[in-house]
Amino acid sequence: KYFYNDVFYKKIKKKKKKDKNLKKIFKKIKMYQKMIKFVYQNQPDGTGDAVLKCKKYLKDKHFLMLLADDLIVKKNCSKEMISLHKRTKGSVIATKKVERKTVSRWGILGFKNKTKNSFSINEVIEKPKPNEAPSNYAIIGRYILPKKILSVLKNQKRGKGGEIHITDAIKTLIK
């Protein structure tokens, strides 16, 4: 619920009338709304809490999670992620390269075995200081995660800001 009261959402809704890309996004959301489940938090309590609220909708071994406040206009981002998941049978997290000085705004990944479009994650840090960041690859609100992350989240201690962070649960699964 808090997202709908957010100034950002109101600005996007206003911009939608003028912006062709946003019009397309809202049109697609409307088209798929019977397949998409929106779950609301009454107050911000972290991405982990949001996932726990979705528990009853998660039927498969893995699920695709899209954060509503991260708009990705790149064509087929989720489709590419699903394709990679089908090939690897593993989790997939969308990333973008950010400036080192801005890493404290993001969940940041450490990795190994980098190829052109993918890498194996070996570390996740939620909003690190620039000198503590393992890279400058930031998580951008698209995940394919295993359903077993629910049990990790359920038993997880609260992280930065007193919230339940999905990044902390991912870190546990990596170990």
List PLM regions with ranges.
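Glycine-rich loop at the start of a catalytic domain that most often binds anionic cofactors/ligands
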Residues: K1-V7
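Generic, ordered loop/turn and secondary-structure boundary motif
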Residues: Y4, G48, I72-V73, G107-K112, ...
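Conserved beta-loop-beta/alpha segment of the NTase-like Rossmann-fold superfamily
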Residues: Y9-K14, L22-F111, K154
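A short, aromatic/hydrophobic, helix- or strand-capping loop or linear motif
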Residues: I12-K16, E163-I166
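Catalytic-core segments of class I nucleotidyltransferases/pyrophosphorylases
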Residues: L64, S78, I82-S83, T115-K175
